[in-house]
Design a protein with these regions (language model features):
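Positively charged n-region of N-terminal signal peptides that target proteins for export
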Residues: 1-4
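Hydrophobic h-region of N-terminal signal peptides that target proteins for export
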Residues: 8-18
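Intrinsically disordered, low-complexity repeat and linker tracts
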Residues: 16-24, 29, 222, 228-247
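Short beta-strand/loop segment at the start of cytosolic alpha/beta domains
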Residues: 18-46
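Structural signature of tandem-repeat unit edges
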Residues: 49-71, 81-94, 103-117, 126-140, ...
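Consensus positions within tandem repeat domains that build extended binding/scaffold surfaces
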Residues: 73-76, 96-99, 119-124, 142-145, ...
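Short, aromatic/basic amphipathic alpha-helical patches
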Residues: 190-195, 211-222
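Cellulosome-associated attachment modules in secreted, modular CAZymes
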Residues: 232-294
Length: 294
């Protein structure tokens, strides 16, 4: 395990990006005429360039032009062992490979719900990371993404997760609760999790597909599998009535509910939001109640 982490750190140091400007201690690269990205100081120094609490700007101005900061580049924070927290603006849509690898003091980072992509080894060996939330649109947990994040005690897989790659969540030695909101058990490759972690971690899954998780390869190796409770949906921002998951309850949800009554979707999170009166059945009663709420 340590050899792998050392290799990745050495490899990442050879892939540093140059920067064009510095804004409040954050190094910014420029691509084309509209895109800016967070990077490091490049190859001019081997010293970690970030420490403490870092706030990434939403926009920067360069040569008289305004750029949105849209991504965190490969290895941007790699090996910054005194970095403690990072705040990302909603303009950031992607975290590139090895972006935070080896940030051993990183305790927290906000991941905007607008985020589209978190790539492989992004948080490898962030051994102090205590909490991180994936965006609800996330469909893949890539290889080594959270490898050896040994301080995580709980983790949430949103309802659109479809695939978990090998080594994605290995060596999470403090993990006690894993919440998976996907109705269909995601394709979890062999080695996605460490078997030792699975034996002491409780897996929380949608009530109606609990049996599927108990039978599927990899998932069945969790020692304790239990159904998700209502308060756990609410804690993660799911709302009764917000059927389309956009954070608002309006006419769009009412129209979608009308369609759902005719053709019930497989997505348990959508069904949970559509069950307005909480009786376990989605029908005209829910439609009438939602219409009154709007």
């Amino acid at each position: 395990m340590q050899r792998l982490i050392t290799y990745l750190l050495l490899f990442s140091s050879s892939m540093l990006h140059a920067y064009e400007l510095e804004v409040n201690g954050v190094y910014i690269g420029i691509l084309g005429t509209r895109i800016a990205y967070v990077t490091s100081r490049g190859e001019e120094t081997s010293e970690p360039c970030y420490s403490g609490d870092v706030v990434v700007p939403e926009q920067v101005t360069y040569n008289g032009r305004v750029y949105n900061v849209t991504s965190v580049a490969d290895n941007a924070f790699a090996g910054c062992d005194e970095l403690t927290s990072v705040h990302l603006p909603p303009t950031v849509k992607a975290i590139s490979p090895c972006a935070f690898i080896g940030c051993t003091s990183l305790r927290s980072i906000n991941v905007p719900q607008s985020m589209n992509v978190i790539t492989n080894a992004a948080f490898t060996a962030c051994t102090s990371l205590q909490q991180i939330s994936l965006p609800k649109r996330q469909e893949l947990v890539d290889s080594l993404t959270f490898y050896c994040c040994s301080s995580l005690t709980s983790f949430v897989l949103p309802h659109r997760i479809r695939t978990i790659r090998c080594t994605a969540m290995q060596h999470l030695s403090s993990l006690t609760d894993l919440y998976c909101f996907a109705s269909e058990p995601p394709l979890a490759e062999l080695g996605s999790f460490s078997l030792a972690d699975q034996k002491k971690c409780t897996l929380h899954v949608p009530r109606e597909t609990l049996g599927m998780y108990q039978e599927r390869q990899v998932w069945r190796d969790f020692y304790n599998i239990v159904p998700l409770e209502d308060e756990e949906y609410e804690k993660e921002g799911y709302q009764r009535g917000d059927v389309n998951g956009d954070g608002m309850i309006d006419a769009k949800d009412l129209e979608l509910l009308r369609l759902i009554i005719v053709n019930l979707p497989d997505d348990s999170a959508v069904r949970w939001a559509a069950d307005i009166n909480e009786d376990g059945v989605i029908n005209a009663k829910d439609y009438v109640l939602l219409a009154k709420l709007i």
